[in-house]
């Protein structure tokens, strides 16, 4: 048994021990935030409803709250004791709802205001990772006045163009020629004021879920993603039965460990907490892993990856949800950000 497998089993055992000693009533009245106003609303509804049903199945006094249909300030009148955030993208994963919950003094799942705001900004995230010596593809911020030929000279082809603040591959284009760059920029700019282009790393697409905070944070098993036609777009992420997910990955123990170490460092340098998921590309020529993005509010749908990794540790979906919520009991007043 590898060291990573041993650590995984230990984490699963700690989760089970935590839940065995958990007083459900101590959680009080729980609000599950779902839906929202971002381009990922549909996925958030799927995640949130799954979370809500899981909590109800465990006897938690849980209630859904959709800030896309209601004014978020109405949270103040709901008398919730804590919040499970199942929102994705802007106005849910970017520090805004976290700031409101801080003002309301409501403990919540996921990262705090600063880490959330940093992680959703792909450019700010890259700057922090690079300053900490973590590998991530070369990039440029694009504008309508960008010199497309200079961009290609810097980043090479193919390259990736995407909105700086969107997730779920929304507005993402794989550009194979300089002539395709203007249209790719316009597509991304239609969703976001900031657009990023980055070198396309060709190789295995991986993701690594993470849990915990600070020095006690841990990396869960790496998952290898094999989408149809090597296209892991919005549809193939959430609705396709053709996308394959390998856990274990079939890669060497050394590569899995390197990816986990990189993902964990990425999580810690951003100051993330509770849980997250780092997306990584493994260069097929060099075997070097490159960080793409950090998700601070990962999906919890039937196709989602964090539940898949947790299951490898013997932690079922409903238990994972309950454990994540239980972590809000550890948050201290004034120390949540």
UniProtKB/Swiss-Prot annotation:
GO biological process: cell wall organization; peptidoglycan biosynthetic process; regulation of cell shape
Subcellular location(s) per record: Cytoplasm
CC cofactor note: Binds 2 magnesium or manganese ions per subunit.
Binding annotation for Mg(2+) 2: 293, 295
A molecular function GO annotation: D-alanine-D-alanine ligase activity
Gene3D superfamilies referenced in this protein's UniProt entry, alphabetically: 3.40.50.20, ATP-grasp fold, A domain, ATP-grasp fold, B domain
Pathway terms, separated by semicolons: Cell wall biogenesis; peptidoglycan biosynthesis
Catalytic activity: 2 D-alanine + ATP = D-alanyl-D-alanine + ADP + phosphate + H(+)
Protein origin, superkingdom: Bacteria
InterPro entries per record: ATP-grasp (IPR011761), ATP_grasp_subdomain_1 (IPR013815), D-Ala_lig_Van_CS (IPR000291), D_ala_D_ala (IPR005905), Dala_Dala_lig_C (IPR011095), Dala_Dala_lig_N (IPR011127), PreATP-grasp_dom_sf (IPR016185)
Keywords: ATP-binding, Cell shape, Cell wall biogenesis/degradation, Cytoplasm, Ligase, Magnesium, Manganese, Metal-binding, Nucleotide-binding, Peptidoglycan synthesis
GO CC terms: cytosol
Domain ATP-grasp: 126-326
Cofactor(s) the protein requires to work: Mg(2+); Mn(2+)
Location (main, coarse): cytoplasm
Positions that bind ATP: 152-207
UniProt record similarity statement: Belongs to the D-alanine--D-alanine ligase family.
Protein role: Cell wall formation.
The name this protein goes by in its record: D-alanine--D-alanine ligase
Organism this protein belongs to: Polynucleobacter asymbioticus (strain DSM 18221 / CIP 109841 / QLW-P1DMWA-1)
């Amino acid at each position: 048994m590898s060291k990573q497998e041993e650590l995984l089993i230990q984490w699963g055992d700690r989760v089970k021990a935590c839940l065995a000693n958990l007083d459900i009533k101590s959680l009080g009245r729980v609000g599950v935030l779902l839906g929202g106003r971002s381009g990922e609303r549909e996925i958030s509804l799927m995640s949130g409803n799954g979370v809500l049903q899981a909590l109800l199945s465990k006897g938690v006094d849980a209630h859904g709250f959709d800030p896309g249909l209601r004014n978020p300030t109405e949270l103040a009148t709901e008398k919730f004791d804590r919040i499970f955030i199942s929102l994705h993208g802007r106005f849910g994963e970017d520090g805004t709802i976290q700031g409101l919950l801080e003002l309301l003094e409501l403990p919540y799942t996921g990262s705090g205001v600063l880490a959330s705001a940093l992680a959703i900004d792909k450019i700010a995230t890259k700057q922090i990772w690079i300053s900490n010596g973590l590998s991530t593809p070369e990039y440029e911020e694009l504008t309508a006045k960008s010199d497309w030929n200079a961009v290609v000279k810097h980043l090479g082809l193919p390259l990736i163009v995407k909105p700086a603040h969107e997730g779920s591959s929304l507005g993402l284009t794989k550009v194979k020629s300089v002539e395709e760059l203007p249209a790719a920029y316009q597509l991304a700019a239609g969703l976001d004021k900031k657009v990023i282009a980055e070198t396309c790393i060709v190789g295995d697409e991986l993701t690594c879920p993470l849990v915990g905070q600070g020095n006690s944070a841990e990396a869960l098993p790496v998952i290898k993603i094999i989408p149809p036609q090597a296209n892991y777009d919005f549809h193939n992420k959430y609705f396709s039965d053709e996308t394959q997910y390998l856990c274990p990955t079939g890669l060497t123990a050394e590569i899995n460990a390197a990816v986990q170490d990189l993902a964990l460092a990425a999580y810690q340098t951003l100051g993330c907490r509770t849980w997250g998921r780092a997306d990584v590309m493994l260069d097929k020529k060099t075997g070097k892993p490159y960080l793409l993005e950090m998700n601070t509010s990962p999906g919890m749908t039937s196709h989602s990856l964090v539940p898949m990794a947790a299951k490898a540790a013997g932690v079922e979906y409903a238990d994972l949800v309950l454990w994540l919520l239980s972590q809000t009991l550890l948050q201290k007043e004034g120390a949540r950000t």
